[in-house]
Amino acid sequence: MKFGWIKTTGTDSEERMESVKDALESSIPGLMVEKEEISSVRELGNIKIVSDSLDADVVLINKGEDLEILKSAKLSGKETAVYVEINTKDDEVYATEVSKLDFVDYVVLEGSDWTIIPLENIIADLFGEEIKIVSVVTNVKDAEAAYEILEKGVDGVVLIPEDINEVKDFSKLIERMNSESLKLDYATVTKIEPVGSGDRVCIDTCSMMEMGEGMLIGSYSRGMFLVHSETVENPYVATRPFRVNAGPVHAYILCPENKTKYLSDLKAGDKVLVVNKNGETRESIIGRVKIEKRPLFLVEAEYNGENLRTILQNAETIRLVGEDGKPVSVVDLKVGTKVLIKPDENARHFGMAIKETIVEK
């Protein structure tokens, strides 16, 4: 997962607190602040604080300072970081060496005359190490370049914003860098039938979804159906663009990092994956999960000779995504209708993808 921090800017404390507010409002994961301002920042909101103080969440020292400080911080349960200005080859060597110490979590790299080459060298030297590499930049364009260097890119970026309006753009960039791109395909409906009543799950998120977005749900791990959000206007009930009426309690849902959960296990505060018809994804936070007894509908579909199934509520407002990329109500499904799915060759064990033969039917 890519992450980003903002380094507070301003000539006085009041200006710096304004940049803290901007970071909080933009959901930036962390802030690099002066140690004298840690308590003031904590009063404004809950955010990871990086500073040269044992009161910070990430204890930071500069190159040349006593590494024993970080050892002590690590023993007390803190994360640790070393800040290195890259001006010479010796600085590169130091950054690489300090990154291999088991009590250092982050190496933060800043270049006074920045080029990509030193960063490429350090990323290559540290390939396979557990250290998180963080680059310091002054604009979103350079942040994007840092995230993509040598395809792997840095793990994080510290933005020192020259324009405060870039903070929101930086937040959007972090979200985009963490979005997974999934390969979706079409399966052909072979059977639709009512199966009686059961406990079905509605997922109410903290995000507004758009037309073409929903969540991947299914009875089988090898093929999940794109269940559309309640964004479609209809004459019976108001739209609920934050909601996916997902299916019964037993069904799988695809979550971030290619993990699955049972719908019955979801709760407020969990993160789920919102997926659009093109396979583009974003994370969303669950605000509420509702489990209610409702009439259910079995949907079977064939994909590459395999039979896939899911069960959905039998209601006009429940939709899959059809061949034209538009939502199609379950009551309008027919044998031969094409619907979007995500095929998967892997089985699942506690939500993790594994190579194992499992029969699901």
From Swiss-Prot:
InterPro entries per the UniProt record, alphabetical: DHQ_synth
Claim: Repressor is one of the keywords in the record: no
E.C. number: 1.4.1.24
Keyword match Chaperone: no
Pfam families: DHQS (PF01959)
Catalyzed reactions per annotation: 2-amino-2,3,7-trideoxy-D-lyxo-hept-6-ulosonate + NAD(+) + H2O = 3-dehydroquinate + NH4(+) + NADH + H(+)
First-tier enzyme category under EC: oxidoreductase
UniProt record, GO biological process: amino acid biosynthetic process; aromatic amino acid family biosynthetic process
Domain of life: Archaea
A GO molecular-function descriptor: 3-dehydroquinate synthase activity
Keywords recorded for this protein, A-Z: Amino-acid biosynthesis, Aromatic amino acid biosynthesis, NAD, Oxidoreductase
NCBIfam families membership: PRK02290.1-2, PRK02290.1-5
Function field: Catalyzes the oxidative deamination and cyclization of 2-amino-3,7-dideoxy-D-threo-hept-6-ulosonic acid (ADH) to yield 3-dehydroquinate (DHQ), which is fed into the canonical shikimic pathway of aromatic amino acid biosynthesis.
HAMAP family: Arch_DHQ_synthase
Protein family per UniProt: Belongs to the archaeal-type DHQ synthase family.
Record-linked PANTHER family: 3-DEHYDROQUINATE SYNTHASE (PTHR33563:SF1), PTHR33563
Protein name: 3-dehydroquinate synthase
Annotated source species: Methanococcus maripaludis (strain C5 / ATCC BAA-1333)
The gene coding this protein: aroB'
